[in-house]
Swiss-Prot record:
The keyword Hydrolase applies. It is an enzyme of class 3 (hydrolase). This is dCTP deaminase. It comes from Haemophilus ducreyi (strain 35000HP / ATCC 700724). It catalyses: dCTP + H2O + H(+) = dUTP + NH4(+).
Length: 194
Protein backbone atom coordinates (compact mmCIF):
# COMPACT_ATOMS: atom_id res chain seq x y z
CA UNK A 1 0.00 0.00 0.00
CA UNK A 2 1.40 3.38 -1.01
CA UNK A 3 1.29 6.03 1.70
CA UNK A 4 -0.92 9.09 1.21
CA UNK A 5 0.09 12.59 2.32
CA UNK A 6 -1.47 12.32 5.80
CA UNK A 7 0.23 8.96 6.37
CA UNK A 8 3.57 10.39 5.20
CA UNK A 9 3.21 13.24 7.69
CA UNK A 10 2.32 10.74 10.44
CA UNK A 11 5.33 8.51 9.60
CA UNK A 12 7.59 11.59 9.68
CA UNK A 13 6.09 12.77 12.99
CA UNK A 14 6.65 9.32 14.52
CA UNK A 15 10.19 9.14 13.03
CA UNK A 16 9.26 5.91 11.24
CA UNK A 17 10.52 7.60 8.07
CA UNK A 18 13.25 10.17 8.58
CA UNK A 19 14.00 12.86 6.01
CA UNK A 20 16.65 15.41 6.98
CA UNK A 21 16.21 18.30 6.68
CA UNK A 22 12.54 17.59 7.27
CA UNK A 23 10.32 18.80 4.43
CA UNK A 24 7.74 21.44 5.24
CA UNK A 25 4.11 20.36 4.93
CA UNK A 26 3.71 22.27 1.64
CA UNK A 27 6.29 19.85 0.11
CA UNK A 28 4.08 16.85 0.94
CA UNK A 29 1.15 16.31 -1.43
CA UNK A 30 -1.09 13.47 -2.52
CA UNK A 31 1.31 10.55 -2.27
CA UNK A 32 4.74 12.20 -2.52
CA UNK A 33 7.35 14.32 -0.78
CA UNK A 34 9.35 16.79 -2.88
CA UNK A 35 13.14 16.49 -2.68
CA UNK A 36 15.74 19.04 -3.68
CA UNK A 37 19.07 18.92 -5.45
CA UNK A 38 22.18 18.77 -3.28
CA UNK A 39 25.56 20.30 -4.13
CA UNK A 40 27.64 17.15 -4.83
CA UNK A 41 28.23 16.14 -8.48
CA UNK A 42 30.43 13.83 -10.54
CA UNK A 43 30.88 13.76 -14.29
CA UNK A 44 32.44 11.36 -16.77
CA UNK A 45 35.74 12.24 -18.42
CA UNK A 46 35.45 11.92 -22.18
CA UNK A 47 37.47 9.27 -24.00
CA UNK A 48 39.54 8.40 -20.91
CA UNK A 49 39.19 4.72 -21.81
CA UNK A 50 37.89 3.10 -25.01
CA UNK A 51 35.25 1.06 -23.15
CA UNK A 52 34.30 -0.41 -19.79
CA UNK A 53 34.23 -4.20 -19.62
CA UNK A 54 31.40 -4.63 -17.10
CA UNK A 55 32.07 -8.35 -16.69
CA UNK A 56 35.87 -8.14 -16.74
CA UNK A 57 38.24 -8.84 -13.86
CA UNK A 58 37.66 -6.59 -10.84
CA UNK A 59 41.07 -4.95 -11.09
CA UNK A 60 40.48 -4.02 -14.74
CA UNK A 61 36.99 -2.64 -14.05
CA UNK A 62 38.34 -0.66 -11.07
CA UNK A 63 41.10 0.85 -13.21
CA UNK A 64 38.64 1.81 -15.95
CA UNK A 65 36.22 3.40 -13.47
CA UNK A 66 39.08 5.36 -11.92
CA UNK A 67 39.97 6.77 -15.36
CA UNK A 68 36.48 7.88 -16.36
CA UNK A 69 35.06 9.44 -13.18
CA UNK A 70 35.85 12.97 -12.10
CA UNK A 71 36.64 13.92 -8.55
CA UNK A 72 33.67 15.14 -6.56
CA UNK A 73 32.48 18.59 -7.63
CA UNK A 74 30.99 20.67 -4.80
CA UNK A 75 28.92 23.68 -5.88
CA UNK A 76 28.67 26.81 -3.78
CA UNK A 77 25.27 28.34 -3.00
CA UNK A 78 23.78 29.88 -6.16
CA UNK A 79 26.37 28.26 -8.45
CA UNK A 80 25.03 26.35 -11.48
CA UNK A 81 25.98 22.94 -12.83
CA UNK A 82 25.53 22.73 -16.60
CA UNK A 83 24.37 19.42 -18.04
CA UNK A 84 24.86 19.38 -21.80
CA UNK A 85 22.78 17.39 -24.30
CA UNK A 86 23.73 13.71 -24.31
CA UNK A 87 25.66 13.95 -21.04
CA UNK A 88 25.31 11.79 -17.96
CA UNK A 89 26.22 13.11 -14.51
CA UNK A 90 25.75 12.00 -10.92
CA UNK A 91 24.41 14.21 -8.14
CA UNK A 92 22.69 13.81 -4.78
CA UNK A 93 19.54 14.96 -3.13
CA UNK A 94 19.92 17.65 -0.50
CA UNK A 95 17.90 15.47 1.86
CA UNK A 96 19.15 12.36 3.60
CA UNK A 97 16.55 9.60 3.91
CA UNK A 98 16.25 6.81 6.47
CA UNK A 99 13.71 4.04 5.93
CA UNK A 100 12.66 1.26 8.30
CA UNK A 101 12.92 -2.40 7.31
CA UNK A 102 9.27 -2.60 6.22
CA UNK A 103 9.06 0.38 3.85
CA UNK A 104 10.38 0.77 0.30
CA UNK A 105 10.73 4.20 -1.30
CA UNK A 106 10.43 5.28 -4.92
CA UNK A 107 12.01 8.31 -6.58
CA UNK A 108 10.28 9.96 -9.51
CA UNK A 109 11.52 12.89 -11.54
CA UNK A 110 9.44 16.01 -12.02
CA UNK A 111 7.27 16.12 -15.13
CA UNK A 112 8.19 19.78 -15.73
CA UNK A 113 11.88 18.84 -15.89
CA UNK A 114 11.27 15.74 -18.02
CA UNK A 115 9.50 17.92 -20.59
CA UNK A 116 12.80 19.77 -21.01
CA UNK A 117 14.71 16.51 -21.53
CA UNK A 118 16.05 15.99 -17.99
CA UNK A 119 16.04 12.42 -16.73
CA UNK A 120 16.60 12.47 -12.97
CA UNK A 121 17.29 8.75 -12.56
CA UNK A 122 18.35 6.64 -15.49
CA UNK A 123 17.06 3.36 -14.01
CA UNK A 124 17.68 3.16 -10.27
CA UNK A 125 14.61 4.66 -8.63
CA UNK A 126 13.99 2.16 -5.80
CA UNK A 127 15.09 3.07 -2.27
CA UNK A 128 15.52 -0.19 -0.41
CA UNK A 129 14.01 -0.98 2.99
CA UNK A 130 16.61 -0.11 5.62
CA UNK A 131 18.20 2.58 3.41
CA UNK A 132 20.00 5.46 5.15
CA UNK A 133 21.76 8.22 3.23
CA UNK A 134 21.38 10.73 0.45
CA UNK A 135 19.93 9.51 -2.82
CA UNK A 136 22.24 9.57 -5.82
CA UNK A 137 20.63 10.92 -8.96
CA UNK A 138 21.72 9.71 -12.39
CA UNK A 139 21.06 12.75 -14.58
CA UNK A 140 20.83 12.53 -18.35
CA UNK A 141 20.05 15.43 -20.67
CA UNK A 142 17.99 14.05 -23.56
CA UNK A 143 17.10 17.56 -24.73
CA UNK A 144 18.67 19.88 -27.28
CA UNK A 145 19.95 22.62 -24.94
CA UNK A 146 22.26 22.69 -21.91
CA UNK A 147 20.38 22.71 -18.60
CA UNK A 148 21.53 24.78 -15.61
CA UNK A 149 20.92 22.94 -12.34
CA UNK A 150 21.35 24.66 -8.98
CA UNK A 151 21.51 23.25 -5.45
CA UNK A 152 18.22 23.51 -3.54
CA UNK A 153 16.02 23.40 -6.66
CA UNK A 154 13.10 20.95 -6.57
CA UNK A 155 14.34 17.89 -8.44
CA UNK A 156 12.04 14.96 -7.73
CA UNK A 157 9.46 13.35 -5.48
CA UNK A 158 9.59 10.38 -3.12
CA UNK A 159 6.73 7.99 -2.47
CA UNK A 160 6.63 5.16 0.06
CA UNK A 161 5.09 1.71 0.18
CA UNK A 162 4.56 -0.50 3.21
CA UNK A 163 5.77 -4.06 2.62
CA UNK A 164 3.85 -7.16 3.69
CA UNK A 165 6.41 -7.55 6.49
CA UNK A 166 9.86 -6.43 7.57
CA UNK A 167 12.58 -7.29 5.05
CA UNK A 168 14.81 -10.16 6.22
CA UNK A 169 17.76 -8.49 4.45
CA UNK A 170 17.30 -4.72 4.79
CA UNK A 171 19.91 -2.59 3.03
CA UNK A 172 21.58 -1.30 6.19
CA UNK A 173 22.17 -4.86 7.47
CA UNK A 174 23.65 -6.31 4.27
CA UNK A 175 27.40 -6.83 4.20
CA UNK A 176 27.42 -6.39 0.41
CA UNK A 177 25.64 -2.99 0.53
CA UNK A 178 27.95 -0.87 -1.63
CA UNK A 179 26.40 2.54 -1.02
CA UNK A 180 25.56 2.31 2.69
CA UNK A 181 25.25 5.73 4.38
CA UNK A 182 26.29 7.60 1.21
CA UNK A 183 26.45 11.36 1.61
CA UNK A 184 27.98 12.35 -1.75
CA UNK A 185 27.75 11.50 -5.45
CA UNK A 186 29.53 8.15 -5.30
CA UNK A 187 30.44 6.66 -8.66
CA UNK A 188 29.54 3.12 -9.72
CA UNK A 189 30.90 0.34 -7.55
CA UNK A 190 30.04 -2.38 -10.04
CA UNK A 191 33.57 -3.69 -9.50
CA UNK A 192 32.45 -4.75 -5.99
CA UNK A 193 29.69 -7.04 -7.28
CA UNK A 194 30.02 -10.60 -6.06
Amino acid sequence: MRLCDTDIEHYLDQDLINISPRPTNDKISGATVDVRLGNSFRVFREHATPYIDLSGPREQVSAQLEKIMSDEIILAEGEAFFLHPGELALATTLESVKLPDNIVGWLDGRSSLARLGLMVHVTAHRIDPGWHGKIVLEFFNAGKLPLALRPNMAIGALSFEVLSGAAAKPYNAREDAKYKNQQSAISSRINEDK
